[in-house]
């Protein structure tokens, strides 16, 4: 595992001027043409991607209508691969695609706004189409019996219908991801149609598939959030950390090349240039396999797969084993008297070999970025002091202690989860975050706590050396979504600081937040709590939700309550529920007991 060298590489990557990487089509115009994409893929895959893209742009059109357009585009693409290609074939694929849409008279009839879009020139035309996409998550799925019958008779029709529904309901989802999900859906259908209880199988497996879909979409949106809200050095540093984690073998030059190419295609994706994005992603897979021997011992299995499957395999590939010869002690970077001389030469450490230890658990990319920032600050301070080695000699201890603290905090949370279970762990998170952000709505706070508990359930179950990357990576995505929703008006100054100060420190900033001292709790009145007999007939999940709403209300009116007092009042609440739900008349009992509970709560109110 690499710590300090990755930190040094992250610093250098932000200071090195971006250079030309793997050769593009031409130095003047690197836009891809339709024949390029067609030649990269099989015809089946090309048509699948085209269907996904037209479904994202023309969301109201039926599958039958779009299939005709897909066939026209496919036929044209095929003609562009031959000797008789027309000048149109040389247009950038994005331009050609929107030319085809605008030339279809049905588009103008069904989409009135398209007339305005089609009057524009690219890239404004493409931006106009994207601006009119509607975000609705209401896919139409056939019943299990119908699905199995269609899959048996016409499997391609079923999979095309899935592409259409998934793409039009997720108009910004990376189109190859739509095809990946379609492939997984096909395997799901094949499996469930063999099961006796098809309804149960489809319900469970589709839930898993949709969770995977949302995870892919969340990660894609998170990258774009970084691109749109932080300097480019942040996304580059994050990509370099990821490349260096996955491929510990290559030298910095090769790692930096892959970082640059990855950053380039992510920016194209986030700016809406989906065609450039797709072809660059596929080309990156090609380049990865061309350098597989230099990169990783584990790439062989991916590079033997078809291109689309190969890309997903590479993205999800486990980290390669760290070569033993790369290990160097951390003291090389904090006790070397010549560190400042090396830093002054080019503000980077290109020749330093990685320091790593296979016995030490993996660190998260967020930790590496934050440490890089702190290490850079340390050198900028110490290298201008009277005695630089004396100034930076404690740097190793600082990094080690911070890492130990993070591992300890993660272990503490996993221990709570394992000891008390997900629901009580969720309540623990609910208490923490209600105190940090009491201005947030009850339902939103409950939703955040539930998602955090899900992350804990997942990440605490992985091997220990994967826990920090898992937990901090997923939590950073969740917190980023929360910050994005609040960016126009933050709910308090402390949240605003965490969301806008530093990407790498965002998660740790939220963790360190205490109760919002500026918050003035509302008075406790008859309207503060609402109890009715619905809780007596609710199922277990509904009862848990009602209890959590009471918990949030309690914290909001008494944010300084200690944990033991919170537990005490939750117990009082449960006693009231038990008493009233066993009474002959439920609601009169709640009406009688409510003032007693409120009176106690008022005594706790500051």
From Swiss-Prot:
GO cellular component, one term: blood microparticle
Tissues of expression: Plasma.
Record-annotated disulphide pairs: 80-89, 102-118, 117-128, 148-193, 192-201, 224-270, 269-277, 289-303, 302-313, 340-383, 382-391, 414-460, 459-470, 483-499, 498-509, 536-581, 580-589
Signal peptide start-end: 1-18
Annotated compartments: Secreted
CDD domains (alphabetical): ALBUMIN
Propeptide positions: 19-24
Assigned keywords, A-Z: Cleavage on pair of basic residues, Copper, Disulfide bond, Lipid-binding, Metal-binding, Repeat, Secreted, Signal
Positions that bind Cu cation: 30
A single MF term (Gene Ontology): metal ion binding
Pfam families, alphabetized: Serum_albumin
Predominant localisation class: secreted
Domain Albumin intervals: 22-211, 212-401, 402-599
Function noted in UniProt: Binds water, Ca(2+), Na(+), K(+), fatty acids, hormones, bilirubin and drugs. Its main function is the regulation of the colloidal osmotic pressure of blood.
Family: Belongs to the ALB/AFP/VDB family.
Name of the protein described by the UniProt record: Albumin A
Organism annotation: Xenopus laevis
């Amino acid at each position: 595992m690499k710590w300090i060298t990755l930190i040094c590489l992250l610093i250098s990557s932000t200071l090195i001027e971006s250079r030309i990487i793997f050769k593009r089509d031409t130095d003047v115009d690197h836009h891809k043409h339709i024949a390029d994409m067609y030649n990269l893929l099989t015809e089946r895959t090309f048509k699948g991607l085209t269907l996904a893209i037209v479904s994202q742009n023309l969301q109201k059109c039926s599958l039958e209508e779009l299939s005709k357009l897909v066939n026209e585009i496919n036929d044209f693409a095929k003609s562009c691969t031959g000797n008789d290609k027309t000048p149109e074939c040389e247009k950038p694929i994005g331009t050609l695609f929107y030319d085809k849409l605008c030339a279809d008279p049905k588009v103008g009839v069904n989409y009135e706004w398209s007339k305005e879009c089609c009057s524009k020139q690219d890239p404004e035309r493409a931006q106009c189409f994207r601006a009119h996409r509607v975000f609705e998550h209401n896919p139409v799925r056939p019943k299990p019996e119908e699905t199995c019958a269609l899959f048996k008779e016409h499997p391609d029709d079923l999979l095309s219908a899935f592409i259409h529904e998934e793409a039009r309901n997720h108009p910004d989802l990376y189109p190859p991801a739509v095809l990946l999900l379609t492939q997984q859906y096909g395997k799901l259908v094949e499996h469930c149609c063999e099961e006796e209880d098809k309804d149960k199988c489809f319900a469970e497996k589709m839930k898993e598939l949709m969770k995977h879909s949302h995870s892919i979409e969340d990660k894609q949106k998170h990258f774009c959030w970084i691109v749109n809200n932080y300097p480019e050095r942040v996304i580059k540093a994050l990509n370099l950390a990821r490349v260096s984690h996955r491929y510990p073998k290559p030298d910095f030059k090769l790692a930096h090349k892959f970082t640059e190419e990855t950053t380039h295609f992510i920016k194209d994706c986030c700016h809406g240039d989906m065609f450039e994005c797709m072809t660059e992603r596929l080309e990156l897979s090609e380049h990865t396999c061309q350098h597989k021997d230099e990169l990783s011992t584990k790439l062989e299995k991916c590079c033997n797969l078809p291109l689309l499957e190969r890309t997903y395999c590479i993205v999800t590939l486990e980290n390669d084993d760290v070569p033993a010869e790369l290990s160097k002690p951390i003291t090389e970077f904090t006790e070397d008297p010549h560190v400042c001389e090396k830093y002054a030469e080019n503000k980077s450490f290109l020749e330093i070999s990685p320091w790593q230890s296979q016995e030490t658990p993996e660190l998260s990319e967020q930790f590496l970025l934050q440490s890089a920032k702190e290490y850079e600050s340390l050198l900028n301070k110490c290298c201008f002091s009277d005695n630089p080695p004396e100034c930076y000699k404690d740097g190793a201890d600082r990094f080690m202690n911070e890492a130990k603290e993070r591992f300890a905090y993660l272990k503490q949370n996993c221990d709570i989860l394992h000891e008390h279970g997900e629901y009580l762990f969720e309540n623990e998170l609910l208490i923490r975050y209600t105190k940090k952000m009491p201005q947030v709505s009850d339902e939103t706070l409950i939703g955040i706590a539930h998602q955090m508990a899900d992350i804990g359930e997942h990440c605490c179950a992985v091997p220990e050396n994967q826990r920090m990357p898992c937990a901090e990576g997923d939590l950073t995505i969740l917190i980023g979504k929360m910050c994005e929703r609040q960016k126009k008006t933050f709910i308090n100054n402390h949240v605003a600081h965490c969301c806008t100060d530093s990407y790498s420190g965002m998660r740790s900033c939220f963790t360190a937040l205490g109760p919002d001292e500026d918050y003035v709790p509302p008075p406790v009145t008859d309207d503060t709590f609402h109890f009715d007999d619905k809780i007596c007939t609710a199922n277990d999940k509904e009862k848990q939700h009602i209890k959590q709403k009471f918990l949030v209300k309690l914290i909001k009116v008494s944010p300084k309550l200690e944990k033991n007092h919170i537990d005490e009042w939750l117990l009082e609440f449960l006693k009231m529920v038990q008493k009233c739900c066993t009474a002959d008349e439920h609601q009169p009992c709640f009406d009688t007991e409510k003032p007693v509970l409120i009176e106690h709560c008022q005594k706790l109110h500051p």
